Amino acid sequence: MNNTAEITVLGAGSYGTALAISLASNGHKTLLWGHDPNSMQVLADSRSNERFLAGIRFPDCLAIEADLGKALAASKNILVVVPSHVFGDVLKQAKPLLRKDSRIVWATKGLEPETGRLLQDVAREQLGDGYPLAVLSGPTFAKELAAGMPTAISVAGTCPSFTHELVELLHSPKRLRVYANDDFTGIQLGGAVKNVIAIGAGMSDGIGFGANARTALITRGLVELTRLGVALGANAETFIGMAGLGDLVLTCTDNQSRNRRFGMALGKGCDVITAQEEIGQVVEGYRNTKEVYTLAKRLGVEMPITEQIYQVLYQGKAPVDAAKELLSRDKKSETSKKS
């Protein structure tokens, strides 16, 4: 491949690599950047990412790059797929290297650590208002996407024409269906809150509560997500779509989810540190819980499930005690604006 690409993907973890593979499998010239030169050389030599996606070969039109400047110069379309806690730092590094015609889309799920700000606010702070922004989200396990299994996601952005171009670029009749959405805020929020609820669902299963309890957590978790989203100006309908209910069900019910497995370990009696070590990869929901809790408190939004998970992760409460407290709360109408 020469030094041009239709899209550059920043982040060579499991999800970034999977999206790069999907794009390249569509015949799009795709460039994948990672911050560690040695690791990227291994990817280039092996034509695979054996650490995260063992056995899946890179398409011919997927190139590897460890130089951020070269990666950003190669394409105007930049897809950021890094953990939420380094999202701002990566954009800060990228800013002086971006092309004037760059457009930024991210698949990072989460909020800004400590502040609970949406990533759109972080992006604008780091980049200013001169670049079109977009986000993609939905129920996706990286290995299934990379393997070409059918998947569906949603895309929303600040510029309708950019959103439309992303739908065309990402969509594949064989592997990936992409829906346009005009709710930029709502699409971002779902990816953070679902990680929190997935930890709760995992804890419930780890304790041994069964399918009834898991389903109740998912359902009431969706209520909490919707309530928080509406408080931020999002459209309630967004949360019954791919980036809301879709991502929530996937993450809460399948053991490919690191957040669910982390919660299961806690429910079985592991402490937080041991549970994280068992997973062996970033558990985004751990940070997301604090971020969502902080945001909800700031907005005055009642999120009882999120609050109990926060107390387990950050205040040492036993998962079984958190469950008891949720069950013993005052009786409410199911359709009440407060749970």
UniProtKB/Swiss-Prot annotation:
Keywords: Cytoplasm, Lipid biosynthesis, Lipid metabolism, NAD, NADP, Nucleotide-binding, Oxidoreductase, Phospholipid biosynthesis, Phospholipid metabolism. Sn-glycerol 3-phosphate binds at residues 109, 138, 140, 194, 247, 257-259. The keyword Hydrolase does not apply. GO terms for cellular component: cytosol. It holds the Pfam family NAD_Gly3P_dh_N. The keyword Transferase does not apply. Its EC number is 1.1.1.94. Its main location: cytoplasm. SUPFAM superfamilies: 6-phosphogluconate dehydrogenase C-terminal domain-like (SSF48179), NAD(P)-binding Rossmann-fold domains (SSF51735). NCBIfam families: PRK00094.1-1, PRK00094.1-2, PRK00094.1-4. This is Glycerol-3-phosphate dehydrogenase [NAD(P)+]. It comes from Shewanella denitrificans (strain OS217 / ATCC BAA-1090 / DSM 15013).
